[in-house]
């Protein structure tokens, strides 16, 4: 599921528990150089009708209201929930930029005031059907609606002094559908699961900028920026677990994830379109072997074939009104000239874990796994999200390659009746780092 569309609209009252896996095995996606957070939602465990309602209020007009209802019988478990959240976020900042050139040095001083007013609505409906005691079929639908208005005031105090005001509105919604099947074959040693997820998200942003400069009295300029984002994905997976005997168990499965991200961008009445497709086909296998009563090993590998394509187009009408003197237009036009970018690649992600039991309540674990950090939509979008401050333009690169990491970890855990202790140390080696590149000059058509 899309992280923003799902996580940002989850109310704490809908959460059953949160599981943290610091160094996951080959069964899990290798995305991200950290661990995995698995959010388990409430589905209801008591027979009959059950429900809860909760609310909260706080500073800066922060409020949220959450409700859950559930009906459970021998064959069915039906559940639903709704939540709303609103509030104000206020931030202030100060920046001092110093630019050092061969001929001279220059400084830029900025004072920023930002006020955000986010509002979110979430609805979740679903149910479980139990054909028999060994299997279940589940469906969940989640809807989220968010609206955020932002007012930003930027005062540049170094000469020439300027005051820039920006007003923006971010309106979006997402629809998430999830179907899953589970079969335990009448035993605790085998399990087959299959799932299909469809996620649709749309985001629409408008931004208006107003500037007053001391260069010309009462100069008031206006620049408008609009963009529409669509972020869709389809995910299908099958996983099978089998405990062959008391010492050996295996896991295997495959997963397909098809993602599509597109942006229609309107800057100064110049139209652009950015589209990014990423298709991932994965298969994995892993095994666990208890060599002795104290010592065991879990090892596996995950193979992924990835196909990515980034394309950036400009409207034919843009050529009628070229604006090569505008730095933002020049940045976008440079990226258009490099389109399209196709990058198919394959990779194997191994993992191995050694576990030693010091006692029945104390264990030591050594682990290694390879990770990948694929570019996110903010890092691949060539369009600056804020266009009102040209002294600090931030835009992504649609032609980025992923970065890889080798992660090693050692953990100690002690679980006693009155005291639990968990400690660990990890080492991470990142290659082909994705990082923001800061520069104070730009080249366009051979000119700096």
Where do the PLM segments sit?
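Transmembrane beta-barrel wall of Gram-negative outer-membrane proteins
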Residues: 61-88, 104-151, 172-177, 183
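Short acidic/polar hinge/loop motifs at secondary-structure boundaries
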Residues: 2-22
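Extracellular loop and loop/strand-boundary signature of outer-membrane beta-barrel proteins
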Residues: 52-54, 104, 108-113, 160-167, ...
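Outer-membrane beta-barrel signature, preferentially recognizing the C-terminal barrel domain
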Residues: 229, 272, 276, 340-343, ...
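Outer-membrane beta-barrel translocator domains and adjoining extracellular loop/strand segments
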Residues: 91-104, 150-158, 204-213, 217, ...
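N-terminal periplasmic accessory domains that precede
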Residues: 4-6, 20, 32-53, 65
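Face-selective signature of the C-terminal outer-membrane beta-barrel domain
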Residues: 122-146, 168-315, 325, 357, ...
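Transmembrane beta-strands of outer-membrane beta-barrel pores
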Residues: 55-61, 73, 84-88, 143-149, ...
């Amino acid at each position: 599921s899309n992280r923003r569309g799902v996580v940002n609209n989850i109310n704490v009252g809908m959460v059953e528990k949160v599981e943290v896996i610091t160094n996951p095995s080959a069964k899990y996606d290798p995305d991200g150089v950290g661990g995995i957070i698995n959010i388990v939602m409430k589905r209801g465990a008591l027979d009959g009708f059950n429900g809860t309602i909760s609310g909260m209020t706080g500073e800066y007009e922060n409020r949220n209201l959450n409700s859950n209802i559930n009906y459970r019988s021998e064959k069915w478990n039906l559940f639903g929930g709704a939540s709303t959240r609103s509030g104000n976020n206020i931030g202030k900042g100060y920046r001092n930029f110093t630019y050092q050139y061969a001929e001279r040095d220059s400084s830029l001083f900025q004072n920023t005031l930002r006020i955000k007013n986010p509002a979110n609505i979430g609805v979740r409906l679903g149910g479980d059907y139990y054909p028999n005691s060994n299997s279940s079929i589940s469906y969940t639908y989640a809807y989220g609606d968010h609206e955020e208005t932002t007012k930003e005031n930027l005062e540049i105090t170094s000469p020439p002094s300027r005051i820039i005001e920006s007003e923006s509105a971010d309106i979006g919604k997402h629809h998430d559908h999830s179907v899953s099947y589970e079969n335990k074959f009448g035993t605790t040693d085998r399990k087959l699961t299959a799932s299909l997820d469809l996620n649709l998200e749309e985001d629409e942003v408008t931004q208006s900028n107003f500037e007053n400069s001391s260069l010309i009295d009462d100069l008031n300029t206006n620049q408008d920026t609009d963009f529409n984002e669509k972020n869709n994905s389809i995910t299908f997976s099958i996983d099978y677990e089998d405990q062959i005997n008391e010492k050996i168990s295996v896991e295997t499965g495959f997963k397909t994830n098809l993602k599509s991200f597109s942006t229609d961008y309107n800057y100064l009445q110049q139209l652009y379109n950015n589209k990014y497709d990423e298709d991932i086909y994965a298969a994995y296998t892993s095994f666990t072997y208890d060599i002795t009563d104290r010592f065991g090993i879990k090892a596996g590998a995950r193979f992924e074939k990835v196909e990515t394509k980034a394309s950036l187009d400009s409207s034919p009408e843009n050529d009628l009104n070229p604006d090569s003197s505008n730095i933002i237009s020049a940045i976008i036009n440079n990226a258009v000239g490099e389109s399209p970018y196709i990058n198919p690649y394959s990779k194997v992600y191994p993992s191995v874990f050694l576990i030693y039991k010091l006692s029945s309540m104390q264990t030591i674990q050594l682990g290694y796994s390879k990770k990948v950090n694929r570019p996110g939509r903010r890092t691949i979008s060539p369009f600056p999200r804020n266009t009102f401050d040209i002294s600090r333009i931030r835009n992504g690169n649609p032609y980025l390659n992923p970065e890889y990491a080798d992660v090693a970890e050692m953990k100690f855990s002690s679980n006693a009746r009155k005291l639990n202790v968990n400690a660990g140390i990890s080492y991470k080696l990142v290659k082909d780092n994705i990082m923001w590149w800061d520069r104070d000059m730009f080249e366009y058509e051979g000119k700096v």
